[in-house]
């Protein structure tokens, strides 16, 4: 029953505990998603021998240059690029890496409501929240008219986009998510989000010069209680 909402599951026995528990913990760390370990009550107090203490597996960095070059080509042909970011940045703690990429490319950023906190709202390239047809009109206009949309660590779900109410061409979206790289007809599931962001920072040589709406921070109000 837990399989649809977890990334790994294990039913623990005295014989498999030393392999299954590390496997599931590694899955939780690498995928940043919930896991489920079923530990029967008659097994919980069983003593077992552990030959080596647990150490998280280090996921190797893969060569993403040829795929990042496709992103470079898309940006060079674009007139109005934008970055949509979301919750995976929070899950993988990639705020610094994302901000580095934004600062060096000067591409404006919007967040999905699901990913609030994914990007520094004090950054001059931050535009605000994009949630489809209920976003601020100037943000709607800019994002919907963009011809190169870098979707970094975000999911364009119905709840995050007001029922899929965005108006941009989905073919202009480059998916740069954990285990999901998609541009045109190229789909790869082998790259982690940290791997992708490191590749963006290393191989993208592009600077945006297009104007974009400036984020206006809500003003604080002084209320008097009577």
Locate each region found by the language model.
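Short acidic-hydrophobic sequence patches enriched in Asp/Glu that either
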Residues: 1, 135-138, 192
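Short acidic-hydrophobic, aromatic-tinged amphipathic segments that line or gate anion-handling sites
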Residues: 8-16, 127-133, 176, 187-200
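Phosphate/pyrophosphate-binding active-site segments
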Residues: 50-51, 168-226
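Cofactor-pocket helix-loop regions in the catalytic cores of large enzyme subunits
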Residues: 15-16, 25, 29, 38-124, ...
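Structural signature of the thiamine diphosphate
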Residues: 2-52, 74, 139-176, 206
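Glycine-rich, anion-gripping cofactor-binding loops and their flanking helix/strand elements
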Residues: 87-174
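Well-ordered alpha-helical segments embedded in enzymatic catalytic cores
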Residues: 20, 66-70, 138, 196-199
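A broad, structure-centric signal for solvent-exposed, well-ordered loop/edge residues
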Residues: 9, 44-46, 50, 96, ...
